[in-house]
């Protein structure tokens, strides 16, 4: 079986420093907001919907940055593709989704790297960080 999820590395500037949005999932992991693609949805539609559902934020997605990882979820016998974009918030009223998300907050670059547990996600984050720095003149 195969599944696909989409989300984004959401960032903002705070006092000239980049901050990144992480969600703390009820399973104990920190991640960037993302979720399953529903039937008939595009990657962009999924990304916008999931960020809104998980954090209450409306965002502008930059589709010029798109990274994908694939991995096997042994416990469910599923091959999963996760697609990540970068995005900036249009609204700033953070409210975490009850049930799935226990907390959502903004963190600096170094803190994000300590909270994310998976090397492939950190690798995508570093690529996104380089991309964001290149467009943030």
Model regions: which residues?
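Conserved N-terminal beta-strand and adjoining loop/helix that marks the start
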Residues: 1-20
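Short connector loops at helix/strand junctions that flank enzyme active sites
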Residues: 3-5, 27, 79-82
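Short, well-ordered beta-strand micro-motif
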Residues: 10-12, 86-88, 108
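Conserved Nudix-box catalytic region and its N-terminal flanking loop in Nudix hydrolases
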Residues: 16-58
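Short helix-loop capping/hinge motifs at secondary-structure junctions, enriched
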Residues: 16-17, 92-95
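Short histidine-centered beta-strand/loop micro-motifs
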Residues: 21, 74-76, 95-98, 115-116
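Nudix hydrolase/Nudix homology domain
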Residues: 29-30, 97-137
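Active-site segment of metal-dependent pyrophosphate-handling enzymes
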Residues: 56-93
């Amino acid at each position: 079986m195969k599944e696909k999820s989409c989300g984004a590395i959401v960032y903002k500037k705070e006092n000239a420093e980049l901050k990144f949005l992480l969600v703390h999932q009820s399973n104990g992991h920190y991640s960037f907001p993302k979720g399953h693609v529903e039937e008939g949805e595009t990657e962009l539609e999924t990304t916008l919907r999931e960020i809104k559902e998980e954090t209450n934020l409306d965002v502008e997605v930059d589709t010029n940055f798109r990274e994908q990882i694939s991995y096997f979820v042994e416990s469910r016998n599923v091959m999963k593709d996760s697609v990540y974009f970068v995005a900036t918030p249009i609204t700033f009223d953070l409210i975490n989704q009850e049930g799935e998300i226990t907390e959502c907050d903004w963190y600096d670059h170094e803190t994000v790297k300590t909270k994310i547990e998976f090397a492939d996600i950190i690798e995508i984050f570093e690529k996104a960080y380089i991309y964001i720095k290149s467009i943030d003149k």
